[in-house]
Amino acid sequence: MNEHSRQDEISTLNTLTATLIDSVTGFEDAAANIEGTSRFQQLFRERAGERQRVVESLRAEVRRLGGDPEDSGSFLGKSHQRFLDLKAAITGRNDKAIINEVERGEDYLKEKFETALESGHLSGETRAVVEQAYQSVRSGHDQVSALKHGLEA
């Protein structure tokens, strides 16, 4: 692999890592603020833990490639969190609103992984790591989506 390709892979992995860190923060925030059953809190805590494990797997791949792993969330994630804090201060938080926001974040994360996988810029080993991470992302997305639709029923 040439240096340019390696740097592209590291950049892609770090972008995904930053977005996953945003996801961890989002799930932790949702668990702390949801008013519903402890089942929701437990689900969000479990997802935050799962996402943290995925973050670590992507960081390990960045290190294997000789890069410096991302250790903070994205600027967009921080901006989105400030918006949510302002929105919550104005409108209050309720379970449905929190779950809707979590699902929005999951949609965004799933799209980021799909874009990375469809790009054709990942080598075999790195692609395998990203595909494994994507399985976790897709599972979380589907679980939150089902939760949201269950509340609407």
Name each region found by the language model:
Residues 4, 41-42, 69-85, 126-134:
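Charge-rich, acidic-biased intrinsically disordered regions
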Residues 8-16, 38-57, 95-101, 125-137:
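Alpha-helical scaffold segments that form or flank carboxylate-/histidine-based iron centers
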Residues 40-76, 147:
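Conserved alpha-helical segments that form or flank metal/cofactor-binding pockets of metalloenzymes
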Residues 98-153:
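Preference for long, well-ordered alpha-helical segments
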Residues 16, 23, 54, 61, ...:
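Amphipathic alpha-helices that form helix-helix packing interfaces
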